């Protein structure tokens, strides 16, 4: 019996970020592909038009953990759903992205939680 797309999506939905990363690496090895985004050249002379568009996807970057690292680790776990070890490794490895490709409201919310915990955060 074939696995339905819904079953696959349900399984992926229940995975942690670390498990998803391992899954992507397995796909890359199995099928000989790369998950890197392909850069598409923009239209020539479109600088003014691009500036007029508002950015919709944001990356929340933990620039520095600050003095209260425990609170920052708790905030990272709350935002990402990572386990304790993964969250600690992320905080220890700062600067690192905490969330990628999120909308402005979610990025601002994550930034506020991290800053309230004592971290220095950048939105890109």
UniProtKB/Swiss-Prot annotation:
Superkingdom per UniProt: Bacteria
GO MF entries: mRNA binding; structural constituent of ribosome
Keywords noted in UniProt: Ribonucleoprotein, Ribosomal protein
Self-association and partners: Homodimer. Part of the ribosomal stalk of the 50S ribosomal subunit. Forms a multimeric L10(L12)X complex, where L10 forms an elongated spine to which 2 to 4 L12 dimers bind in a sequential fashion. Binds GTP-bound translation factors.
Gene3D superfamilies, per the entry: 3.30.1390.10, Single helix bin
Family that this chain belongs to: Belongs to the bacterial ribosomal protein bL12 family.
Pfam family for this entry, one: Ribosomal_L12
GO biological process assignments: translation
Function, in words: Forms part of the ribosomal stalk which helps the ribosome interact with GTP-bound translation factors. Is thus essential for accurate translation.
Signal peptide segment: none
GO CC, alphabetical: cytosolic large ribosomal subunit
Keyword Ribosomal protein tagged: yes
InterPro entries: Ribosomal_bL12 (IPR000206), Ribosomal_bL12_C (IPR013823), Ribosomal_bL12_C/ClpS-like (IPR014719), Ribosomal_bL12_oligo (IPR008932), Ribosomal_bL12_oligo_N_sf (IPR036235)
Protein's UniProt name: Large ribosomal subunit protein bL12
């Amino acid at each position: 019996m074939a696995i339905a797309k819904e079953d696959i999506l349900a399984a992926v939905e229940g995975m942690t970020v670390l498990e998803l990363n391992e899954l992507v690496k397995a796909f890359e090895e199995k099928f000989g592909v790369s998950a890197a985004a392909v850069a598409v050249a923009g239209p020539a002379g479109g600088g003014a038009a691009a500036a007029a568009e508002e950015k919709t996807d944001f990356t929340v970057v933990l620039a520095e953990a600050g003095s209260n690292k425990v609170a920052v680790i708790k905030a990272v776990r709350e935002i990402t759903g990572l386990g304790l070890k993964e969250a600690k490794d992320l905080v220890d490895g700062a600067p690192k992205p905490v969330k990628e490709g999120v909308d402005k409201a979610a990025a601002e919310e994550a930034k506020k939680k991290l800053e309230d915990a004592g971290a220095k955060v950048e939105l890109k």
